[in-house]
Curated annotation (Swiss-Prot):
Listed GO MF terms: oxidoreductase activity
PANTHER family: BAEYER-VILLIGER OXIDASE MDPL, PROTEIN, PUTATIVE (AFU_ORTHOLOGUE AFUA_5G03330)-RELATED
Pfam families from the UniProt entry: Questin_oxidase (PF14027)
Keywords: Oxidoreductase
Annotated protein name in UniProt: Baeyer-Villiger monooxygenase nsrF
Species: Aspergillus novofumigatus (strain IBT 16806)
InterPro entries to which the protein is assigned, alphabetical: Questin_oxidase-like
Keyword DNA damage: no
Length: 433
């Protein structure tokens, strides 16, 4: 069918109000009607009424208006009760209810995103401690989402991040956090540099082999925490951060450096360079510990706790990837390919010109931030910072060079860097003639 396309003017004729309509059983959620209004307007502006000659009718508005979800007011209204809140946590199907709840919390008179995050993550109540642990679930995605909301001052993203944390299915990391914190609190273990703890994980047959490929997506829950819980708790509890500004900043840099080390250090000789998809998130999420570390409304004790928990979970993820050998020369001696001759500015521009679902750009930005915040500590603490100086950019180049030629996520990364069979899926390295 040949048509002449004329851009339709935007008209304000698609605002729904949550009024009773024919055949309605329950009231509609205001959030649902707002979302439907937006979708109807987008359909009006972008999509034709006919998408093929025969029976090609646009049914999008019909579907939107017929399938409006009902308001779950009884659930949302009761969530201020910690027992009710906790009852609905860790259930993916409760995300919408938690989102509506946190939106309401943020819209309360005199409320703010800082006050809501403080109440539900940093008030040291049993519920807040559980919510704080949930921020680290799902390969750090809730804290990444929340971090963006705080960094860019977007309450809507804060609500989404909190709702994601509350509803995310569990890997049981809350039990791990509490056990490691309790053991560290006994004073029976001396504090050690994080780089030494990575080496402890690598040296432990129990930890290195706890996760199995057959665990699928549950290598943390069923592998490391399921088969080597006491061992990983004993190692992780040795990373301890004092509640003073200097130690929190130093420990944050230490965490960033070791996370980057776990990404740039592993390599299988004879294979193309690849960064591990899972360990990459340890770096990507690290930037938000700068964001949270600079938040004046978070106490220094809570900032220390945040960094402790992040570094301890990074150790778990390192073990979940079979604790690969980390060799400094794999990034210090790296010869760039596509990024040869680039600086940070040129690399940023290059990132905007190729196919990326956001993972590479977030990883590179986190490395740039780490380079900046690490600089004041690199001379005094060089021995505990495996990545420093030019190495931050080298690892960013590895990431860009190894992903830019691929559009499929499966080909951009190695999916379990310490497991030999996963390297079988990576092409052999071919020397250019």
């Amino acid at each position: 069918m040949t048509t002449t396309t004329i851009e339709a003017p935007a008209i304000a004729g698609f605002h729904l109000s949550p009024e009773k309509v024919l055949g309605q059983v329950e009231p509609y959620s205001p959030g649902a009607t707002d979302a439907a209004s937006t979708l109807l307007q987008q359909n009006h502006e972008k999509w034709h009424m006919y998408f093929r000659d025969v029976a090609g009718h646009n049914h999008i508005p019909h579907a939107i208006l017929t399938a409006l979800p009902p308001m779950e007011a009884p659930t949302v209204g009761k969530m201020r009760d910690p027992a009710v809140f906790r009852q609905h946590m860790q259930r993916l199907d409760q995300y919408s209810n938690f989102l509506a709840f946190f939106e309401q919390e943020l819209e309360q008179p005199g409320s703010s995103k800082e006050a809501v995050v403080s109440r539900y993550c940093f008030s040291r109540t049993p519920l807040a401690d559980f919510m704080l642990a949930q921020l680290f679930e799902g390969l750090y995605h809730p804290i990444i989402h929340l971090g963006f909301g705080i960094e860019f001052h977007l309450p809507g993203l804060v609500a989404e991040g909190l709702a994601q944390a509350a509803s995310h299915d569990p890997m049981k990391i809350d039990v791990f956090f509490q056990a490691a914190e309790a053991l560290a609190g006994t004073g029976s273990l001396a504090s050690k540099p994080l780089v030494e703890l990575y080496r402890q994980v690598r040296a432990s047959d129990t930890l290195r082999t706890a996760a199995r490929l057959s665990d699928g997506p549950w290598k943390v829950r069923d592998g490391v925490l399921g088969r080597a819980f006491d061992e990983i708790v004993n190692v992780a509890a040795q990373f301890q951060v004092s509640s003073n500004e200097h130690d929190v900043q130093r420990a944050t840099v230490e965490m960033m450096s070791c996370a980057a080390w776990a990404c740039g250090g592993p390599h299988r000789p004879g294979k193309e360079r690849k960064i591990d998809f899972f360990l990459m998130h340890c770096v990507t999420s690290s930037i938000f510990f700068t964001v949270l570390g600079r938040a004046t409304w978070i106490s220094i004790a809570d900032k220390a706790r945040l960094v402790e928990w992040k570094a301890r979970l990074d150790l778990v993820w390192y073990a979940a990837c079979a604790a690969p050998e980390l060799r400094d020369e794999n990034f210090l001696n790296y010869e760039p390919t596509l990024s040869r001759g680039m600086d940070w500015r040129q690399l940023y521009h290059a990132l905007n010109r190729y196919h990326d679902d956001g993972h590479v750009a977030k990883f590179v930005r986190a490395l740039k931030n780490a380079e900046e915040v690490a600089l004041p500590f690199e001379q005094e603490h060089a021995d505990i910072l495996p990545v420093k100086g030019d190495a931050w950019f080298r690892i960013a180049q590895i990431c860009y060079d190894s992903t830019a030629s691929h559009t499929e996520a499966q080909k951009k990364w190695v999916w379990g860097v310490g497991f030999a069979p996963m390297w079988d899926l990576v092409p052999d390295f071919v020397t250019s003639s």
